[in-house]
């Protein structure tokens, strides 16, 4: 489901960009209908395959990706999704932040690569929320969120690459965290 969720986010992100640039109206109603049908099928696959460890009550980066994917899809289909289902998704997103990150902001999976991926997922999830929802989550988790950013900054080496500690599957959604140039890092 994680891959499906990441694809859904990228589809919506790309669709938004292309829609703004579509002066010739290539993305017509027929395209939109097919796109929305395809996207809705993504939500069904994600919901039917949530990657949560119900036995041990743990959620990892896969479940966080599932929830972020659903948040993006539900935000796009806001009129077609029940208020209860959307709100539960927002609650699960905040719960994932608490379970995925220690109070210090470090990811519990003990991997700098997973920390980068999950921090990216949190950023992407926060972007799609309403300002009220986003502010509430940031206020409730300010220390964690600031800590996750600080730790990510510490994990970037002099060559602007992330220092490898723990597992690494090279996972990424949308590259929100751009590398700083070595010149800029030397100046700091």
PLM ranges: what are they?
Residues 1-146:
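Aromatic-lined, polymer-binding surfaces characteristic
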Residues 110-119, 123-188:
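Extended polysaccharide-engagement surfaces of secreted carbohydrate-active enzymes
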